Every structure is written in C-alpha cells, then in structure tokens.
Amino acid sequence: MKGLFLRIITALALLFWAIDMVFPWQFLRHTEENHYTAIQARGSLYVGTINNQISYFINKDSERGFEYELAKAFADTLGVELEMKIFDNQEQLFDELDKHNIDLAAAHLLYHPKNAERFQIGPAYHSASWQLAYRKNENRPKNLGNVKKDIYISNNLALEETLKELQKQYPQLIWKRNQALTQEELLLQLAEGKIPYVIANSIDIAAIQQIKPELAIAFDITDEANVHWYLPNNPYRDLQTALLNFMNNAEETGLLDNLKEKYLGHISQFDYVDTRSYMNAIENTLPQFSPLFEKYKGELDWRLLAAVAYQESHWNPDATSPTGVRGIMMLTKNTAQHMKISDRTDPEQSIKAGSEYLHWLISQLPESIEKEERIWFALVAYNIGLGHLIDARRLTQNLGGNPDNWFDVKKNLPLLAEKRYYSQLKYGYARGYEAHQYVENIRRYMNSIVNYHRVQENQTTNDNANNESAVKNLEEIKENKD
C-alpha cells in the first residue's frame, strides 16, 4: 500500500512538472497572435518600409519601389491587400515590428546577429555593405583612423553595434546618431557640404549619387552582408514558411531578377562628369522644354520622353549628327516625313514627332510583351530599328531565353555585333551593345529626373513644416509675454 502511495505521489509530481514545463509554451501559443491567420482574417498585409528612391516612393500618385512591388506580389500570393506603413529610420521600423504593429519590415535591411536574435528573418534576396561617404574634392580618408571630423549615422542600433566593435580597433572613432533625419536626408546634407561624413547603406549611396554626384565613397566599413525581410518573433512559423515559398518562387520565375534590373540596374553605373552635366541640364535647360514633353507625352511618362531627348541631343534643338539625324529628338529625314513634320530643328515639332514615333513602335510589338516592359523594346527599335529588335528577340528564344522578357533580351543585344550570331539572323549586323547602353542611359536619366523632383518636393515640404513650426513658436512666445 505504501509503495502504491509513493508511486502515485511520484506520478503526480512528474505530471505537475510536465505541466509546468509545457504550460508556458502552450500559454504563449494561445496568447501570442499567429500573424499568418491574423493577416488572412483582416484581409491585408501590413508592411513597414522607409521612403526613398529604391524601397518605396510615390510616382504620379501611384506607389512604386523595389520593396513595394515585391511586397505586393507576396500579398497577392496570400490573397490579401497590401498596406504600406512608412517610417523615417530602421529603429522606428523595428520598434513597430517588435510591437507586432506590422507583419514584416522591408527596406533593404542588412543582416545583423542582434536583429536575427530579436526577429524572424526571411530568405536573403540581395546584398549590400556599410560605406563611409564623403564629399568629392575633400580629403579622402583611407581608413577610420584617418577620419578627423564628425561621422553621422541615422537611427540604427545594429549599425552602432558594428561601430562599437570597430571602436576596439580605432579607439578615436566617434559618431553622431541623428534621430531626426533619414539616411537619405543625411546623404543630401553631406552632398550640400553641411556635414563632413555619413555612414550609409551602399545601395542608398549609389542611388543618391545619381542625383548628387558630389557624393563619393571613401571605403567599405563592413564586408557585403545579406539583405532580408524581418518578421515578428513568434512561436508560429506559418508566415515565415509562406515567405520562404514565395521568395523561392520569385527566384525561379525571374521576379527578383526583373525587380533588381528595374530598380537597381541603373545605379551600378556612375560617371561623375556625365552626372554633374546632366544635373546642371535638369536645373537649367529642362524647365524650358518640360511643358512640351508634358504636352506630347501621350501614354508615356513625360520624364521618359525627356530622358530620350537628353540621350539623343542633350536637349539641344539644333543638334546634328554626321549621319544626318537632327533636332532635339534626333529624327531621320524618313522618320520626319513619316511623322509629317517640316522642321526637325523646331523643338515642338521634333518632340511631337518623336513621341508619336515611339507610340507607333510600341504598337508594333506583340501583345505578349508586358505593358511595363514594352517601352524598353520600343527604345531598342528607336535606336537600331525594328528589324534588329525582331532579330534580338528571335536570338533570345534560340538561346533558351524569353523573347518577351526585357531582362533576357537585353543580355543578348550585344550578340547582334558578333558574326557567329548575326550571320544567322534576317537583318544581319547591328551595334546591339550600343542599343543596350542606350536604353540603360535613358532609364538612368529618367530615374534621375523623377528623384530630383521628389527630393525637391520633400525639401519644400520640410521647409514649409519648419516655417510653420517657427511661426507657431513665435506665437507661443508672444502669448507667454502677454
């Protein structure tokens, strides 16, 4: 009997111990929100990001950006609406993620062990590094030991952890964390000479250089690190699993490559002299022609039409080439006759005809090419002719690529100048490498116009807000005196 009693007591003790061990986890699972089911229930995916020219921005009243388009595709696979929530810096983003106010954070966020402990992470989809940026024509430091002036960073605790580690090697290293300005705003202040150094994400620096060529890179602070989306730390893995499946599919279908090409392809090319000349032209020459580009844009973005004109003539109405093309859109005699214009050097006639010709080229393309990509194919035809574009698409198909995909066709354009390929094509030799660069330049020029105006509008908004704040402070001071 005594033995039975002891066995019962032991069994009860083990049972209570087991409950004690299991209950906290079970309690957590029952009290912690399952984000995947919450997303399905509310019918929307909350994605936090940062407003800049790569991750997310508004263009012609529509949402754009690498992270926006990728998040939209993810929301579509979940069968829910996408709702973007915008923050000024990484810490604001992570604080809201920690509070479970957003479902994921997407802003080209670099991997850091501290953040990986704090949150779940999605698959890597890109890479970047931290770099020290300085103003061109200033002394370029060779390493952190040579930096004698203030280094500024945005509100980013993970970056600060990295700098604290570097401080062991460079004891004199100090930095200032600015919680009021975004990383992009700090880089703009650096370009204007208001601050001496900024440590920023290599992607953001390359993007800002396209409109602020005064920015220069001194050196990398860190090696390349993977870029991830971050998710709330949660005992449920449903959302993380769905994201893993989505990213794998985005890789296989080419979605990731297409987005990288669209938003990051142009920033890999940077020439100080060309960019500086172009920004001067945007400020001083474009305003006299922009009304015409807007007037005759048709179905195109007027800034794209302006970019084509800059690539063709640098916005010079009297431009002439040795081959006989003339005017701001550099039209041939045949094209001018086809478009029924009498004076190729008249800016209005030239812009109108150039736009109509581009629209005609777009109309000649097969419907199987997606709407967003049709313009890039048309620009190839504008540059080297419709026949050579047909050859490029046929060659792409012969080589196992997709003739309707710009990313695939663009890679094969240079092959039009190689005899082993053009000898097998209907229209023969073409300077396909020039057409490839032609389209890349136009994309870069267009993005620079878009982002130049975006930055100008943001600065105007900030100035107005500061003025309103100053007026309010003066009124409060006056009231206090009264």
Curated annotation (Swiss-Prot):
Active-site annotation: 312
Region listing for LT domain, in residue ranges: 268-482
Annotated GO biological process: cell wall macromolecule catabolic process; cell wall organization; peptidoglycan catabolic process
Subcellular location(s) per record: Cell outer membrane
Membrane topology (UniProt): Peripheral membrane protein
Non-LT domain: region residues: 19-267
PROSITE patterns for the chain: TRANSGLYCOSYLASE
Domain of life where this protein originates: Bacteria
Disulfide bridge map: none
Bias-annotated ranges (Basic and acidic residues): 473-482
This enzyme's EC code(s): 4.2.2.n1
PANTHER family: MEMBRANE-BOUND LYTIC MUREIN TRANSGLYCOSYLASE F (PTHR35936:SF32)
Job description of the protein: Murein-degrading enzyme that degrades murein glycan strands and insoluble, high-molecular weight murein sacculi, with the concomitant formation of a 1,6-anhydromuramoyl product. Lytic transglycosylases (LTs) play an integral role in the metabolism of the peptidoglycan (PG) sacculus. Their lytic action creates space within the PG sacculus to allow for its expansion as well as for the insertion of various structures such as secretion systems and flagella.
Full protein name: Membrane-bound lytic murein transglycosylase F
Organism annotation: Haemophilus influenzae (strain ATCC 51907 / DSM 11121 / KW20 / Rd)
Lineage: Bacteria, Pseudomonadati, Pseudomonadota, Gammaproteobacteria, Pasteurellales
